[in-house]
Amino acid sequence: MHHRLAALVLLATTVPGLITAQITSEQWNEIDLLHERDRHAEVLSILEGLEGTASGDTERAGLLWRRARAEFNQIDLALYAGELSETDAMDRLAQTQATADEAARMSSGSAPAQAHFWRGAARAKQGELQGVLNALFMADDLREDLRLSAEADPEYSNPYYVAGQLYQRLPGFPISFGDGDAAVSFSRRAVDLHEEAYSAGEVPLRYWDYYVRLAENLNSRGWSQRRRERLIANMSEDYSAAETPFERAMYYEAVTDIPDQSDAAEAAELLNFVIESLESQDELSLRDERTLSDARELAR
């Protein structure tokens, strides 16, 4: 009996696949850094190679949401570059959504934040490609994905970034839940969280589109300095009554420092910051080229 057990132990340590090694933190970090550099094809290749290495649901979920993230960003940038048709993009986005959904079902810890977010991102892009009516139809599901992402990790900036766009672009009551004031608060929350992460060295690059979307939402709201001071002060009660991180982010301006200027003046400063920063770089990624183009258009 003991000899049989010893033989099984020896077999497990010598035959590939019988014991699954854990994915190391260095491997996760490499994948995430490649993502930040928009090297998504490389990310997908590495993830494919690690599929047989994952040990347990948490690691498998980590592979899945990272695959969904890479797939989504590949699709998004290929659409912008004119390298992918909208029909093909819709098919691929459906698969991306399914991948993120699988990650959300099996993951634990902080992983659901990313899983829910990338499922929502794929859903949002599908709605955008299909037109206004489909975007309205998907809005509630997208908001729920963003809410779940924020619940899983309140310090994760992405759901607030997308919520800022969602609440800005949707019509308000009674058609939908669009709200320009909430859009600004969501965008400001995303920028502040990103600034904290960037300053702490948790992300290697600035997400310039965060600042552009905040500027866009400020311009759309268009409050004067005096009105800002008065109405933002009135948000405090709503912030205190909010029960979840996502709801509190809707009134985030009540609890953060706001520049003593109008919405338009702050938006102009943000756009100038983005334009000057990107124009000073020797080489821009496709994503940053798009962001610079958007910033210039809004600054006109």
Briefly describe each language-model feature range.
Residues 1-4:
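Positively charged n-region of N-terminal signal peptides that target proteins for export
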Residues 6-17:
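Bacterial N-terminal signal peptides
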Residues 18-83:
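N-terminal leader/linker segments that initiate helical-solenoid repeat arrays
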Residues 24, 61, 113-114, 157-158, ...:
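Helix-start (N-cap) detector for alpha-helical repeat units in TPR-like alpha-solenoids
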Residues 34, 42-45, 69-111, 118-148, ...:
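Short coil/linker segments at helix-helix boundaries
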Residues 51-56, 200, 239, 280:
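Solenoid-like repeat scaffolds
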Residues 157-162, 202-219, 288-295:
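Amphipathic alpha-helical protein-interaction segments enriched in hydrophobic
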